[in-house]
Every structure is written in structure tokens, then in C-alpha cells.
Amino acid sequence: SGWKGMVSSHLGAIRGGVAHNGTDIVPPSVMYSLIAPSQGIVIGTQTGFANGVTQTKGNAQRGNFVFVYYGESSSGGVFVLYQHLSPGFSWKIGDTIPAGAVIGQTGWSGLCYSSHGGTGEHLHLEMYYGTQQVNPEAYMSN
């Protein structure tokens, strides 16, 4: 199936004098459903932010998010953070997300830049092997 959408900001890209700490993907449609690539366990969530209401302080900049542990690999545990989601998902810490389930829908909660125009809706994606951040683009295919 692969990834749908366009990468609008790469990991490490300089924005406002600061290196971007994730990969931004513009979805192919509004509130695009994000599907779990495999079974995972929710290790962090944040909800309660409306789309389009800019948050500028602390963790609120992340907007609504789901942080998922996908198990061990030869490089350590695989962790993925899905950020700026639309409100409405109900995952809680400790929940198991089955492979193929909807994690959430893309949105523009938190602090979203409009570098690609429009509302600023996008998925901010961060991926880690253990404590080492890796570039998720290396694992994305069309």
C-alpha cells in the first residue's frame, strides 16, 4: 500500500533557524485516515486540541498525538510518534492497536506551519529505534 501524500518538510530541515525534528507529510485528502502498519502498543497520547487553533507553548505545540511502540528490532525498540492529528481518536496508554486499524486522522492541531499553503494540515512523523531517532523516509515507499 505504501505512503500517500507528499513530504513537505524533511527531518533536519532548517525552519526559523531551528532543525526540524520530524518529517511532515501533506495528506492526499482532508482528515486522511492513518492506518497502523503493524500491531503496536500506545505509550503516549495527547488530546483536547481543536484543528486550526494555534498552540505555542510546550507540549501543546504537538497538538493531538499518538505515540506507538511497535516491538523490538535488531536496532532496538521501534517507536513512532504521529502528531497534529484531528480530534476524535480514543486510544489510551496501554491500548493495543491492531495492524490495519485507524490510528487517527491527519489534522492541524497544535503549532502547524503552512509552508505548503492552505490550512497547514499535515502529519508530523517521528521514528525511533530505541533512543536513536531515525529518518522515517527511509521506510516509506509509494
Named regions from a protein language model:
Residues 1-37:
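Polar/charged, compositionally biased leader and regulatory segments
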